């Protein structure tokens, strides 16, 4: 093989802090830490839309949510999926001679129950069998499901609607399948691109093998000073039913799942080395978004705090130097970055900015930033907006994450939601507990600059949120 291979591993709902080498959460990840020590460790990788489907759409297309149309998750009751005409990284790699493979969670297809109460595939709830063809967007080898969170009893589809049911923790099983694929790839001259998306540590948190749970049975709390266990809720006003003890156990299980992923990642690295593929394979380890785990009284994702938007990213192997990359890398930046690292053409459709140069040099990139985006997507939130004649894509929040600041313009999720502008200084206030609240961006020079960047982006993307920037915020 003369061309470089790609192994792209990403977990669901895994925050940047939850890795030993990050020096924050008390999580055990020796294999990941060792990989980071000889690779390029990205300090500011960011999920631009911290939700599964929207991030994945940007990841594969190199485009922002306004362009992909992915304003929420693919879910029952909504006709939302990755459009057939989108040009994805899998298609680009296939057209340039790569064998392409996808093993694990997809979550870019529409649930089958939107069209049939009893799908032939047996898919239920949010799940779907994605048949061979354009909806796989260039991936030839397919061992996947749309979305289902039964981590200990997963199922998959290949090229028929007959599901493959498994009694094994999903990351372990998917790693088994990936290693078999690598063994086959080692015997071929053709370069490969293998994408391996693990679902854990996504909730339900307790679906994790007992040997990993035992690692954290004596863990003391709180693990972060901004955790508020008394008023837990989600990004909507919906309250969580978790007690403080529930949160403690969920956090233990969350870390346990990450330690389990660490073991599986080590198995992958060992296989690459044993098969003689390690020196010619770029390996990327990352996630689609993080998890609040009680910080600011919040659970899950879909908010602008670092626990939600901050994702791990380590890039190593095949000519990638050891070091630290300080560039703020957003969701849409990943595809053009990978293509440039592999010396492949970047389609004109891709809107993200390649970080290949910074990954190869370890540049600090003090002036780098990415855009942030979120819309209301739950059916209970969409109905009042529809009744009021309001486009849900004009609501939610938009923002900028730069090296030092996170700047947010929040219009809320309801027709009568108050506007707010928030500026977080991540150097002075890393736990984001004391934002500067502004009526207008002009009240603060830093906010004025960042809102200028935001306005240019919203105008370029024809985002219906843009007129909100002309309104004065009412929350102080």
Give the residues covered by each predicted segment.
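Residues forming the ATP-binding cleft of Hanks-type serine/threonine protein kinase domains
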Residues: 427
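Formylglycine-dependent sulfatase
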Residues: 1-410, 415-419, 431-456, 463-476
